């Protein structure tokens, strides 16, 4: 059981990130979405370690935040950001019938570029305003973003018969499949209180806002498109991360 879990986690990391890991023959990529919140936490740990190292060296907070966001893109290979850009281009089209066609176009339009700039600015500026427990904030943001992806997969139809994200619907079929990721994020949110018992408010508000932002973001894209695609899964991740960081600037 443990070996199978580790192999599935390895497959998820290979699929969702550019982290150099050895490929093992026979990995099952059909269920990678089940462990995606855990992949988010791993990304958050890496970003937190980088941020802590730069802080130790005395690097200014704005520069640190910008470099963290740059590494964020590098670790994910821009996978989710590319999806957010394609989604923005599609939603900019007035004709609903053409939106999926525009999203499938590899060329980046003006709205896609603007959405990427907005996401990166929000992440960088929000991180700059967060002074305490940045490593934990990064873990929570990455985790909630990917739990939002699971919500989109479980709760809403997939709009393409084929596509990069089509097989995710086979891995996450119902609300029950959201519970492991939610329990994991409850545990991560509780760390705010465990490291400082005066931060119970951050724990509670972070848990409520994280789950709410993830769920509402997935619901909003479904409302606009009538379902989801692989691109909108990426958009849910990116916008959930950015908005969650913005909310935490009020609390930390």
Curated annotation (Swiss-Prot):
Cross-referenced InterPro entries: CobS
Residue ranges of the TM segments: 4-24, 35-55, 65-85, 102-122, 178-198, 201-221, 232-252
Superkingdom of origin organism: Bacteria
Pathways per UniProt: Cofactor biosynthesis; adenosylcobalamin biosynthesis; adenosylcobalamin from cob(II)yrinate a,c-diamide: step 7/7
MF terms (GO), sorted A to Z: adenosylcobinamide-GDP ribazoletransferase activity; cobalamin 5'-phosphate synthase activity
GO cellular component: plasma membrane
Disulfide bonds: none
Membrane topology: Multi-pass membrane protein
Pfam family, one: CobS
Family per record: Belongs to the CobS family.
Chain's role: Joins adenosylcobinamide-GDP and alpha-ribazole to generate adenosylcobalamin (Ado-cobalamin). Also synthesizes adenosylcobalamin 5'-phosphate from adenosylcobinamide-GDP and alpha-ribazole 5'-phosphate.
NCBIfam families named in the record: cobS (TIGR00317)
Protein name: Adenosylcobinamide-GDP ribazoletransferase
Species name: Trichormus variabilis (strain ATCC 29413 / PCC 7937)
Classification lineage: Bacteria, Bacillati, Cyanobacteriota, Cyanophyceae, Nostocales
């Amino acid at each position: 059981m443990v070996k199978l879990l580790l192999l599935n986690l390895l497959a998820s990391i290979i699929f969702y990130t550019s982290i150099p890991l050895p490929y093992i023959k026979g990995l099952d990529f059909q269920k990678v979405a089940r462990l995606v919140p855990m992949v988010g936490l791993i990304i958050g740990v890496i970003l937190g370690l980088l941020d802590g190292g730069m802080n130790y060296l005395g690097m200014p907070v704005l520069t640190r935040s910008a470099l963290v966001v740059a590494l964020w893109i590098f670790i994910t290979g821009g996978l989710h950001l590319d999806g957010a850009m394609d989604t923005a281009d599609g939603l900019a089209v007035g004709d609903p019938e053409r939106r999926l066609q525009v999203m499938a176009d590899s060329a980046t339009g003006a709205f896609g570029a603007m959405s990427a700039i907005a996401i990166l600015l929000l992440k960088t500026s929000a991180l700059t305003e967060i002074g305490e427990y940045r490593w934990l904030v990064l873990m929570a943001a990455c985790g909630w973003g990917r739990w939002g992806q699971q919500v989109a997969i479980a709760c809403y139809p997939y709009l393409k018969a084929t596509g990069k994200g089509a097989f995710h619907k086979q891995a996450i079929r119902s609300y029950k499949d959201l519970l492991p990721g939610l329990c994991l994020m409850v545990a991560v949110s509780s760390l705010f209180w465990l490291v400082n018992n005066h931060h119970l408010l951050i724990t509670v508000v972070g848990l409520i806002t994280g789950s709410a932002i993830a769920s509402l973001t997935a619901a909003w894209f479904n409302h606009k498109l009538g379902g989801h695609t692989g691109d909108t899964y990426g958009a849910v991740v990116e916008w959930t991360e950015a908005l969650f960081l913005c909310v935490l600037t009020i609390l930390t």
